[in-house]
Amino acid sequence: MQFSLSIATAILAATASAMPVLETRQTVGTTANEFTSGGCKDVVLLYARGTTQAGNMGQEPGPELGNALKARLGAARVAVQGVAYSASLLGNLNPGGAPANEATSFRTLIGQVASQCPNARIVVSGYSQGAALVHRAVEGATAAVRARIAAGVTFGDTQKQQDGGRIPGLDASKTLIICNTGDRVCEGTLIITAAHSGYGARAGEAVDFIAARV
């Protein structure tokens, strides 16, 4: 028995040493704090989730966007940071589609990244009410901070029509607003239909746009 156990141990050790070492994959879930906990990367994605979604990234399309961007550019180059805000139903009823104080907090976060990471390319993004938060945060930022934003991408944007298909203060060449056909919130209403979901499938479209600008 002792002899057999020794042989088995040796075989297991040899097999383990011959196995390839798998690279640990960093996956983005419903919560991501890679800037606040890990600092600067070449690209910092700041993302605001939709109304009532979980964590600070939501169920979709935030995680899909973060993971697709890491896959395209390399996980070591990208820090994904969710935006902490209430994402309440009533938040949508505020002027501009989002609470002013929470837009200010998002704006402060953008400024923090710009200050602490002078070489980083900043990307701002959001879904639904989170898209409105992007609009309100960017429009109130200083010109110097806005100049640091490489791309702004929104999904199911509740402020698309109100703001003329743009993010105020951000150059049109840096802006992509993704809206599904039939998504009524992109038409200036708060009527939720099936078309307001499924934006995770369009993360690749967003990444193509971002990658060309960072």
Curated annotation (Swiss-Prot):
Modifications after synthesis and translation: The 2 disulfide bonds play a critical role in holding the catalytic residues in juxta-position; reduction of the disulfide bridges results in the complete inactivation of the enzyme.
Source organism superkingdom: Eukaryota
GO biological process: appressorium-mediated entry into host; carbohydrate catabolic process
Inducing stimuli: Induced during infection; levels are increased during germ tube and appressorium differentiation, and during penetration.
Active site: residue positions: S128, D183, H196
Catalytic activity, as annotated: cutin + H2O = cutin monomers
Cellular compartments annotated: Secreted
InterPro entries, sorted: AB_hydrolase_fold, Cutinase/axe, CUTINASE_1, CUTINASE_2, Cutinase_monf
GO cellular component, one term: extracellular region
Pfam families in the record: Cutinase
Record-annotated site: Transition state stabilizer: Q129
Documented EC number(s): 3.1.1.74
Cystine pairs: C40-C117, C179-C186
UniProt note: phenotype after gene disruption: Decreases secreted carboxylic ester hydrolase activity during growth on cutin carbon source. Decreases conidiation and results in abnormal germling morphology. Impairs penetration of the host epidermis and decreases virulence in rice and wheat.
Its job: Catalyzes the hydrolysis of complex carboxylic polyesters found in the cell wall of plants. Degrades cutin, a macromolecule that forms the structure of the plant cuticle. Required for efficient penetration of the host plant cuticle by the appressorium during the initial stage of fungal infection.
Protein name: Cutinase CUT2
Organism: Pyricularia oryzae (strain 70-15 / ATCC MYA-4617 / FGSC 8958) (Rice blast fungus)
Gene name linked to the record: CUT2
